[in-house]
Amino acid sequence: MVKCMKLGKAVILLQGRYAGKKAVIVKSFDDGTDEKRYSHCLVAGLKKYPSKVIRKDSAKKTAKKSRVKCFFKFVNYQHVMPTRYTLDLDLKNVVSGDAISSNDKKVTALKEAKSKFEERFKTGKNRWFFSKLRF
């Protein structure tokens, strides 16, 4: 069986609070772990997409519209739909399993991931990932 859930693959979440949101696979567990026996992955995604920026907006308004909110989540493979896109964003050292369990580590990891996502958005790369999924 070909493994399509690789690091950096862009996926769309199908179930739960973040259904319909885009995310990136940070780490995959094909054989499961002791706590979760099923195959799953750790994803980092966009909770809130950046708004559309127009030319007449001021610099302050442009900065406000360019903000993103992100999330981390362990997701079952059956609850994600892989896409053909990849995002070469290095979040492996930012996000880890223990960072999700403790609250202070999670807050700092979310801030780091947010800055990386915003930086990627401002450079103009991976435009598909930062646009809202219309359905």
What are these regions (language model features)?
Residues 1-20, 26-135:
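Ferredoxin-like alpha/beta domains used as RNA- or RNAP-binding modules
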